[in-house]
Regions:
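Alpha/beta-hydrolase superfamily serine-hydrolase fold, recognizing
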Residues: 1-203
Length: 203
């Protein structure tokens, strides 16, 4: 497992964080032998903004045919720079991650509204998703990002990508980080670990 210390907004807005992640992937491929990596099991993973970067990196790698990924693991990911969803309307405030906070995040990461429409910023806007690695999504129901996460899972399935989606009713954004407080958080972490084990045993 390699954790990428990518540079972050607002000091380093798009595309710098994504470039850092993709550079790390390329480095892993070029130095696989010395790092002891099995390239047949190379995957990307991330939660929230990290989920956005993981999904975007998978899109870029597939488009440029630079790196072949085994899978992508997206935990309550950001998949579109749009606030016009049922989840944003329903959970705009009072449920942890708020509409106002997400608007601020987007202003720091991608200030230009036109650039936000690009697929590497909003993976849900990708014109093609065929050929992407199988995807595993873990979504919190009471999360402003729930609808876009579900929509991305649907888009991938319709594009012929193998998808597994787990939805956790009543959970808030980032709930896996609070597994000490939520039984469902512990359950989700356990299920994620089992999914990882199963997926890579057959790789």
């Amino acid at each position: 497992m390699i954790s990428v210390a990518y540079r972050r907004a607002p000091e380093h807005p798009y595309p710098i964080p994504l470039d850092d992640c993709c550079d790390a992937l390329t480095y892993c491929v070029e130095h696989a032998s010395e790092l002891g990596l099995d390239l047949g099991r190379l995957a990307v993973a991330g939660d929230s903004a990290g989920g956005n970067l993981a999904a975007a990196a998978a899109l870029r790698m597939q488009k440029n045919q630079q790196v072949t990924l085994h899978s992508q693991w997206l935990l309550y990911p950001v998949t579109q720079a749009s606030f016009d969803t049922t989840s944003y309307r329903r959970y705009a405030s009072g449920f942890g991650l708020s509409l106002a906070t997400m608007q601020w995040f987007w202003d720091q990461y991608v200030p230009d509204a036109e650039v936000r429409l690009e697929a590497e910023v909003s993976p849900l806007n990708a014109s093609r998703v065929d050929g992407l690695p199988k995807a595993f999504l873990y979504l919190a129901e009471r999360d402003v990002l729930y609808a876009e996460g579900l929509a991305y899972a649907t888009k991938l399935q319709q594009g012929g990508v193998e998808v597994q989606t787990r939805v956790y009713p009543g959970m808030l954004h980032g709930f896996m980080h609070f597994s000490g407080f939520f039984d469902v958080g512990r359950q989700a972490l356990s299920e994620w670990c089992l999914d990882l084990k199963k997926a890579f045993q057959t790789a």
